[in-house]
């Protein structure tokens, strides 16, 4: 326990928090190029084939990014936009694709939560 005098002289060192998405370097999104698009399986107890892509960012980082929504049009050399946000049951996946921007198309026939999947509003049936 420091004395009052020691605190006056030195003060307390503030703890620095580690970034959860270091490759973004404090930017909201980053652009990158897909180097590999593939599926992977989640941790126990879940079971699925999750769509992910390895992406080389403009700042030189190479990260794994999750492709949300049903169906996608991505392949190698697609230019994509990456945002932060991990996938809890996929170890090492700390980023998400932004659907509906650059080469990534929005989810087709999406009715709810459209803004999260880059889907335009459906035309009203008459």
Swiss-Prot record:
Keywords: Methylation, Ribonucleoprotein, Ribosomal protein, RNA-binding, rRNA-binding, tRNA-binding
Gene Ontology CC annotations of this record: small ribosomal subunit
Record region (Disordered): 1-26, 102-126
Keyword presence, RNA-binding: yes
Residues found modified as 3-methylthioaspartic acid: 89
CDD domains: Ribosomal_S12
GO BP field: translation
Molecular-function GO terms, alphabetical: rRNA binding; structural constituent of ribosome; tRNA binding
Compositional bias per record (Basic residues), positions renumbered to this chain: 113-126
Role description: With S4 and S5 plays an important role in translational accuracy.
Family per similarity comment: Belongs to the universal ribosomal protein uS12 family.
Subunit structure: Part of the 30S ribosomal subunit. Contacts proteins S8 and S17. May interact with IF1 in the 30S initiation complex.
Protein name from the UniProt record: Small ribosomal subunit protein uS12
């Amino acid at each position: 326990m420091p004395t009052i005098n020691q605190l006056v002289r030195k003060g307390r060192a503030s703890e620095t928090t580690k970034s959860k998405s270091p490759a973004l370097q404090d930017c909201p999104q980053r652009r990158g190029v897909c180097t590999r698009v593939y599926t992977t399986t989640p941790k126990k107890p879940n079971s699925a084939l999750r769509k992910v892509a390895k992406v080389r960012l403009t700042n030189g980082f190479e990260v794994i990014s999750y492709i949300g929504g049903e169906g996608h049009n991505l392949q190698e050399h697609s230019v994509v936009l990456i945002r932060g946000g991990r996938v809890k049951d996929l170890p090492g996946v700390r980023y998400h694709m932004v659907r509906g921007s650059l080469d990534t198309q929005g989810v087709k026939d999406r009715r709810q939560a459209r803004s999260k999947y880059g889907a335009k509003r459906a035309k009203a049936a008459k």
